[in-house]
């Protein structure tokens, strides 16, 4: 199988030193799993994956636990059947749901290997390009978990290794046993904690950062404004950023971003994602969606650059935030 390369699109970026090149916007498939997103259906989900591919996104991210029975991976397997040679597929292992849809962490090597094999079967793949430890298991050393990834590399079931939701100490311990090529942390205009220590370490060790939540669960897409009424079952209501002073601070940021969007002729979401994917150390930003128009919009963040005056204004807006 040919490796996706930079010749397919000039702005593709390399994951670590792997020779695997990806678009600066990736499709994140958590929303189509239907676990927390409302009004998800199979037809729209398949159309959304296809829209991502048609919009120039070659990087699709999923996980063993995206869906109580792996719905996300199964949909991806159907959608990419005729596109595999052009795509980079990432998945994750280490989390599963029980019959009561309660989440469990399991970082034992035998579990990680078994979950990888299940993911390969669901997506009808021979190899997963990038495979992450989804999160640390409090009962298993990350060093022990790392041994499974060495086994998966040696067996040809995965091409590159990543970790998600690990702190820097855990990353270093894992990396000492099995070298990592990418990490997947949250990062956006409202959450920049990784810049203190994590990004410098990644730059020093040639590790890519594939960030999730660039739009902070839709808040920075520009559609959720003051007075927005959330459905009672909307899981976003469990996040402090959607309440009180943090929410108002985000609204003030959006007020400023409106002006930049008008100036550039782009949407707020496109401005936010473009800024995010071009921050130092960021290789690709994961953008989810349950409808085709959503991923088409965020894919429109690729292929252009914010001017210096816009970047300076965004810096001022972020520095003025008051979010705990």
Tell where the protein language model's regions lie, with residue ranges.
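Beta/alpha (TIM)-barrel catalytic core signal, keyed to glycine-rich beta->alpha loops juxtaposed to Asp/Glu
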Residues: 4, 136-323
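Aromatic/hydrophobic pocket-lining residues that form the small-molecule binding cavity
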Residues: 45, 49, 72, 109-112, ...
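CE4/NodB-like, metal-dependent polysaccharide N-deacetylase domain
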Residues: 111-132
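Structural motif corresponding to the early beta-alpha repeats
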Residues: 82-107, 134
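N-terminal binding-site loop/beta-alpha segment at the start of enzyme catalytic domains
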Residues: 1-87
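Conserved beta-strand positions
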Residues: 27-29, 62, 91, 130-133, ...
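Active-site mouth loops of central-metabolism enzymes
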Residues: 31-43, 99-113
């Amino acid at each position: 199988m040919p490796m996706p390369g930079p010749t397919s699109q000039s702005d593709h970026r390399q994951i670590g030193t792997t020779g695997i090149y990806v678009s600066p916007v990736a499709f994140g498939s958590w929303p189509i799993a239907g676990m927390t997103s409302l009004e998800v259906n199979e037809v729209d989900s398949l159309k959304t994956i296809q829209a991502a591919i048609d919009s120039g996104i070659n990087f699709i991210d999923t996980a063993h636990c995206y869906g109580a029975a792996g719905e996300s991976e199964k949909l991806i397997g159907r959608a990419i059947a005729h596109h595999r040679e052009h795509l980079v597929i990432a998945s994750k292992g280490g989390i599963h749901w029980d019959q009561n849809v309660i989440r469990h962490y399991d970082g034992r090597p035998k579990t990680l290997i078994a979950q990888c094999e299940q993911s390969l079967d669901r997506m009808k793949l021979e190899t997963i390009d990038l495979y992450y430890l989804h999160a640390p298991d409090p009962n298993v050393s990350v060093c022990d978990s790392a041994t499974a990834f060495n086994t998966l590399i040696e067996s040809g079931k995965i091409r590159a290794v990543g970790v998600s939701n690990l702190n820097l100490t855990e990353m270093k311990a894992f990396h000492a046993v099995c070298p990592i090529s990418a990490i997947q942390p949250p990062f956006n205009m409202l959450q920049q904690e990784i810049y203190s220590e994590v990004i410098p370490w990644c730059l020093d060790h040639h590790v890519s950062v594939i960030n999730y939540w660039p739009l902070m669960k839709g808040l920075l897409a520009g559609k959720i404004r003051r007075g927005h009424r959330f459905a009672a079952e909307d899981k976003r209501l469990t996040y402090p950023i959607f309440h009180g002073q943090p929410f108002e601070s985000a609204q003030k940021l959006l007020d400023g971003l409106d002006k930049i969007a008008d100036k550039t002729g782009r949407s707020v979401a496109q401005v936010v994602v473009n800024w995010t994917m071009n921050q130092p150390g960021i290789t690709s930003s994961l953008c989810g969606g349950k409808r085709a128009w959503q991923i088409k919009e965020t894919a429109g963040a690729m292929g252009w650059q914010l001017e210096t005056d816009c970047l300076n204004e965004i810096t001022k807006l972020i520095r003025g935030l008051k979010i705990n």
